[in-house]
Amino acid sequence: YGPSPKLVRLNREGFTLVPGLKRKTPVYPGMLLGEHPAPDKGDLFASIHGEISEITERSVFLAATDPSKDAPEVEPVDLLGQGLEGDELALAVKKMGVNTRSLGRRCKTLIINALNPDPGVTWAEPMLVSHVENLRTGMELHRRMARADNVILAVPKGSKVAYEGIPLAY
């Protein structure tokens, strides 16, 4: 993990904040702060241990504090194990704070872009080697949301990565 920010600004436009949320409210990572009515806009969650320092018309500001001893832990959720697909899965992911607009469109073939985003940026390939289970899980979740028949992983030409059961395109 990297350094934690001292102050976090969260966009609250369009969100209905949870009742009782106000300045000085203690927050912890994964705490629900607001819900968005749009089906493809992820709900709003705290990302750090801290307290609400300010709420404006457009933002919620969180000031970092040391975690309290009684702060709840966020429990992992096994979305694959729940067997959800399509809109039901997209709604479950939305309730976890993920914007799903580009994830849930139905398609026959889903192409996952694993290319480095910009020239000189070289983190994508090491991630493909060291985080294979995360990659598989993410690809399966995306496949289920899009109800795709085929999933292809696009990797850089000359890439040395290979995965059992995952077709590659160069």
Residues covered by each model-derived region:
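N-terminal, Lys/Arg-enriched amphipathic/low-complexity engagement segments
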Residues: Y1-G20, E35
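A structural signal for short beta-strand/turn segments enriched in small hydrophobics and glycine
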Residues: K24-L33
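Short coil-to-beta-strand transition motifs
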Residues: K41-I48
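Buried, small/hydrophobic-residue-enriched core segments of structured protein domains
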Residues: A46, T56-Y170
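Conserved hydrophobic positions within beta-strands
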Residues: G50-I52
